[in-house]
């Protein structure tokens, strides 16, 4: 009875890249469902090849690849018939009534052109910085856990959980240093609840509450990475030293 299967190309919180071609083939071999992938996080970060992905629908949002806010696109494979989203005029092939936002559309098109011209160079550069930052954190800050795939991961995403320190505390104290990070997705910013994504991968308790997401850009530098890790080390050390459970843990784990 399923009419639609929708799977993220890459997760917005932990950066894991899904095996979309294989998943799409599996769905189509076992049903007549339309297959949609949400490529909002992935477009402009990794190569997107519609023909190889084998999808019926693909959506992306311009602000994720340095385009205007409030505009995106939906790829519809030829032969897939969709009803009108709302009734009125016949704009956008009769799917979405209303006057088109031409400046935003043109801006999105130009942003897509520019980001694809430098995609591989940008992706490789961010991957190197991402791996460098992960290495420094894992080597210099004990009791941390990298969330998501280490290999099949967006080049700009680092999601790490730290035991015995609250993620929101890290966010606030880094913000005071002029460093912007988040304790979850941008959609849930400001909510002091454990991310459902983090819970779904099995993290609980102190480790789950200590989750922080770092997002890089094509403008991020190695110097900024070093400054961030140095500030992060100091913040976590100071806050752990104020946590009685941390000292009990250390006492119980002395060899």
Residue positions per predicted region:
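Pyridoxal 5′-phosphate
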Residues: 1-255
